[in-house]
Amino acid sequence: MHDKILILDFGSQVTQLIARRVREAHVYCEIHPNDVSDAFVREFAPKAIILSGSHASTYEDHQLRAPQAVWDLGVPVLGICYGMQTMAVQLGGKVEWSDHREFGYAEMRAHGHTELLKDIEDFRTPEGHGMLKVWMSHGDKVTGLPPGFKLMASTPSCPIAGMADETRHYYAVQFHPEVTHTVKGRQMLERFVLQIAGCKPDWVMRDHIEEAVAKIREQVGDEEVILGLSGGVDSSVAAALIHRAIGDQLTCVFVDHGLLRQDEGKLVMEMFVGRLHAKVVHVDASEQFLGHLAGVTDPEQKRKIIGREFVEVFQAEARKLTNAKWLAQGTIYPDVVESGGTKTKKATTIKSHHNVGGLPETLGLKLLEPLRDLFKDEVRELGVELGLPPEMVYRHPFPGPGLGVRILGEVKRDYADLLRRADAIFIEELRKTIATEHDAAAGLCEPEQVGKSWYDLTSQAFAVFLPVKSVGVMGDGRTYDYVVALRAVQTTDFMTAHWAHLPYALLGRCSNRIINEVRGLNRVVYDVSGKPPATIEWE
């Protein structure tokens, strides 16, 4: 049985990052709403509890409180931002509204050599004080310590930026250790989880495979399972895991909507039929999808049409498999949290996935989601352990609607063909171009990244078709052809992203090859927008 951390979510946009940092320490954790019952907290039996941040005000909103069981269990508790404030209020301290709100980078002084912060510092002042570079995001602040607590940290704007009751192993910080902007944040969370809470770092994928396989066999028995295979990481890993558990009881349906990447259908069939010997039904529905997309320019309408048509095609194939009793999906933990699947009232539905919808209810099937407890990086690790090739497991993310949302405006087959070829050239050049010492000296990459491909050094890269024409010259003739934009970003969590500073020589090769090899395109531009203000995808 694994040690578990319970994360109570008060509505922060970055609660998932807390869970990711805990999982990176190889400790299992789950996110649940702050208003779970005392009985739930006791039955969960956590080794420790973490209270998240929130957009709410402790001073004004008396409803967002941690269950009493949090304080009765006798386990270590870490409060983060709002979590610190509710800890203070519930344990007899004082919180006040501040006329000096603090958002962004801050330098914080550690006090008292607490177990949480001892020997963790970014630099020292001339007076010898240990300082930390942290990320603040709060309006209210603690102005009075609860009984038994001592000061742990402070900033000029926030005299009580951290507090601790080391007898009860209660710690609280006003900053966000889970975000990358807090330089030593990961180290702090690891210390809380591994040393203060005493969790064993035994959450590893090899063990998880055995547990997941056993659970799938127990759930499914001798019944059959159908899975929509997209070629993306999540559905591919789910298919490989389920196939390992039940073999030919699984049938995969691969729908080609005409908006896939270059040779994607071929690669999927080679992998799952050729190497894993799985049963795969390949449906070419490109005419159906493209026909319904004709004349549609609104991005959200395009997504809805693609989602609707996918459901229709998948339903038609599923009904042919009369023995199927289960629908498998590659749902991962962020999907569960974002869709409110953790039953938290605080979670806002951010997106709906085009291949989920109401399929299980419509088809009368039971739902099998073997990846629903895993983050994306854990899914990739699982895929490698299952024997999937790294080039498939570590492919950049690809949207469910495919090229349909990378073609601005109306989707046409000719546009998709042009974009597919341009995108393939861009990805090929990224894969074969290796970062050099010159790149590191120019500040384009870190010294330790020298020798890696630029594909591996970017988090997501793709081409976008722009439905505008520009004048060009090729040979002795004038051209009037379409424009393609290249987009490459670097990010740790996809919540924020920087545009990738690719070498000019690499961009030049991409431009030359695209213009010379893809007839119909005569201009290539590079997107230098970060997120925010832009999103990663254009639509």
From Swiss-Prot:
GO terms for cellular component: cytosol. Residues 203-395 form the GMPS ATP-PPase domain. The keyword Ligase applies. ATP binds at S230, G231, G232, V233, D234, S235, S236. InterPro entries: Class_I_gatase-like, GATASE, GMP_synth_C, GMP_synth_GATase, GMP_synthase, GMPS_ATP_PPase_dom, NAD/GMP_synthase, Rossmann-like_a/b/a_fold. The keyword Lyase does not apply. It comes from the Bacteria. GO terms for molecular function: ATP binding; GMP synthase activity. PANTHER family: GMP SYNTHASE [GLUTAMINE-HYDROLYZING], GMP SYNTHASE-RELATED. Keywords: ATP-binding, Glutamine amidotransferase, GMP biosynthesis, Ligase, Nucleotide-binding, Purine biosynthesis. This is GMP synthase [glutamine-hydrolyzing]. Pathway: Purine metabolism; GMP biosynthesis; GMP from XMP (L-Gln route): step 1/1. The lineage of its organism: Bacteria, Pseudomonadati, Pseudomonadota, Betaproteobacteria, Burkholderiales. The gene is guaA. Homodimer. Pfam families: GATase, GMP_synt_C, NAD_synthase. It catalyses: XMP + L-glutamine + ATP + H2O = GMP + L-glutamate + AMP + diphosphate + 2 H(+). Its EC number is 6.3.5.2. Gene3D superfamilies: 3.30.300.10, 3.40.50.880, HUPs. Catalyzes the synthesis of GMP from XMP.
